[in-house]
Regions:
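Short beta-strand/loop motif that positions the catalytic acidic residue
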Residues: 190, 196-198, 202
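Catalytic nucleophile-loop/oxyanion-hole region of alpha/beta-hydrolase
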Residues: 50, 71-108
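C-terminal catalytic histidine-bearing segment of alpha/beta-hydrolase fold enzymes
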Residues: 218-270
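Primarily recognizes the serine-hydrolase "nucleophile elbow" in alpha/beta-hydrolase
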Residues: 92-170, 174, 178-179
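Short beta-strand element of the alpha/beta-hydrolase
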Residues: 34-43
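N-terminal cap/lid segment of alpha/beta-hydrolase-fold proteins
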Residues: 1-33
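Conserved alpha/beta-hydrolase "acid-adjacent" motif
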Residues: 203-212
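Short amphipathic alpha-helix adjacent to the substrate-entry channel of hydrolases
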Residues: 51-69
Length: 270
């Protein structure tokens, strides 16, 4: 495995955003010579990325046959309000994968974006906005290179007025127009098929966020799969001992979401 890092700055857009890739090398003469690309957009309240949990999650999907790329997007300490910069960062990451598909052994037509918590907000919004003229203009990339083929959301922030961020000061650091960044309000017929999971007892990002996005996808007949697990705290990642930052995170039942998501992708791309 080769671990690579790419800064996402362009001539017209300067950013500290980085894309870290965990690149597998195909086994000679194996029937598997290409891998599904997965861009992982972690949480961290737009202030940081939990590196240790993020690595474990990335490697878990790598072990399941993905070429995994972790997006370190723009934080509120670097730009306020932070939006739309994380969306531009993600657009540039998607475009880079499409450009490097042959060199990195990628199935470019099976590109999945996975986002958790605040990263889920970035991912859900990107699912809404990838085709728009304004994102094409800001990223400098044609829309046909920006399309996600599938989206996975874990305990995502969807609406800035549904419980997270917790206060107006923090919301203002995220967006100057919360309505524009209500991901449920901007779902449309071009959204990608979406897999979502959360827990009923999440006390940080209420379950209503995930449900509102599900309802919006339903209204537009976008294929989806939704799992609301009975209990579990916020920030579970792959929900096993490797990422258990406190005791309640290690939950084998919730950890099934990983296999469920992989099975869903197998069915989607068969």
């Amino acid at each position: 495995m080769e671990i690579i890092q790419k800064n996402l700055s362009t001539a017209s857009y300067q950013t500290k955003a980085m894309l870290t890739g965990y690149l597998q090398t195909p086994v000679p003469k194996s029937p598997v010579q290409q891998f599904r690309p997965l861009i992982f957009v972690p949480g961290g309240s737009m202030t940081h990325i939990p590196v240790e949990q993020t690595e474990k999650t990335a490697l878990s999907f790598s072990a399941r046959g993905f070429q995994v790329f972790v997006l370190r997007y723009t934080f509120t300490s670097e730009h306020q309000p932070v939006y739309p910069n994380p969306l531009i960062d993600l657009a540039l990451a998607v475009a880079l994968l499409r450009k490097q598909a042959a060199a990195w052994h990628l199935k470019a037509d099976q590109l999945t974006i996975m986002g958790f918590s605040a990263g889920g907000h970035v991912t859900a919004l990107y699912n809404d906005y990838w085709h728009t003229k304004w994102l094409r203009r800001l990223s400098g990339v044609a829309s046909d290179q920006l399309r996600p083929n599938a989206v996975i959301l874990g305990y995502p922030v969807i609406d800035l007025n549904l419980g997270f961020p917790k206060d107006a000061t923090t919301r203002a650091k995220w967006a100057d127009d919360p309505a524009r960044y209500n991901a449920a309000a901007h779902v449309n017929n071009l959204n990608a098929p979406t897999f979502m999971w959360t827990t009923f007892t999440d006390q940080v990002v209420p379950v209503q966020n995930t449900l509102s996005y599900s309802q919006a996808l339903l209204a537009h007949q976008i294929p989806q799969e939704l799992h609301v697990f009975a209990h579990g705290p916020h920030g579970m990642d792959i929900a096993n001992a490797l990422v258990a930052h406190h005791d309640d995170v290690d939950q084998p039942h919730v950890a099934h979401w990983v296999e469920l998501a992989c099975e869903w992708l197998d069915d989607l791309f068969k």
